[in-house]
């Protein structure tokens, strides 16, 4: 894996150099992995290598609701989310990414953790069809920017491609904690 710059961040949000390094790692990780394995690997990568990502999870769209699959961070009470409900449901309904700089000012926010201050949700798309989404929370306000969005959109694209190649889409009967 490529080394990530260890110099302190000037800003909390992702910078372009870090995005490029992590994007290269995404490509290597995705090569030859089936969809479920890829999802677990990317959740673990983001949680381990991006300090301001304090919770990372992947929701899959099944029968009109988002179901939590692999995640890293504290367990969430929101393992199933209806389309249109919360920030996750809004992103899935719209088929576009949503960045919330301060969850305390967004009435759509479904409280998962008292420490969460900002959130980004990026849908996984197959054309115009939403397959699921990547949800990331931070305990810092204004933690996400367009570089975070670009990185997560690349990950979402890789996952969507793996799901599209799968004979059977991945499915979790219960959320799966990645890492420790």
Say what each PLM segment does:
Residues 61-114:
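Regulatory sensory and allosteric helical modules in signal-transduction proteins
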Residues 132-133:
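Short glycine-/small-residue motifs
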Residues 53, 116-118:
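Short, small/polar residue-rich loop motifs at catalytic or cofactor-binding pockets
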Residues 118-125:
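A short, aliphatic-rich beta-strand micro-motif
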Residues 2-76, 163-180:
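Intrinsically disordered, low-complexity terminal regulatory regions
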Residues 2-7, 137-155, 162-171:
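Regulatory loop-to-helix N-cap segments in sensory/regulatory domains
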């Amino acid at each position: 894996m490529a080394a990530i710059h260890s110099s302190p961040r000037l800003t909390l949000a992702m910078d372009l150099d870090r995005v490029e390094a992590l994007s290269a790692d995404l490509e290597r990780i995705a090569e030859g992995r089936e969809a479920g394995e890829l999802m677990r690997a990317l959740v673990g990568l983001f949680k381990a290598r991006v300090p301001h990502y304090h919770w990372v999870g992947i929701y899959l769209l099944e029968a009109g609701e988002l179901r939590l699959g692999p995640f890293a961070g504290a367990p969430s009470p929101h393992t199933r989310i209806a389309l249109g409900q919360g920030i996750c449901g809004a992103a899935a309904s719209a088929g576009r990414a949503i960045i919330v700089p301060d969850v305390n000012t967004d009435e759509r926010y479904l409280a998962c953790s008292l420490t969460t201050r900002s959130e980004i949700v990026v849908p996984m798309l197959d054309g115009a069809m939403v397959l699921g989404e990547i949800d990331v929370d931070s305990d810092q306000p204004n933690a996400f920017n367009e570089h975070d969005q670009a990185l997560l959109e690349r990950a979402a694209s890789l996952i969507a491609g793996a799901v599209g190649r799968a004979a059977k889409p991945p499915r979790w009967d219960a959320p799966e904690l990645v890492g420790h």
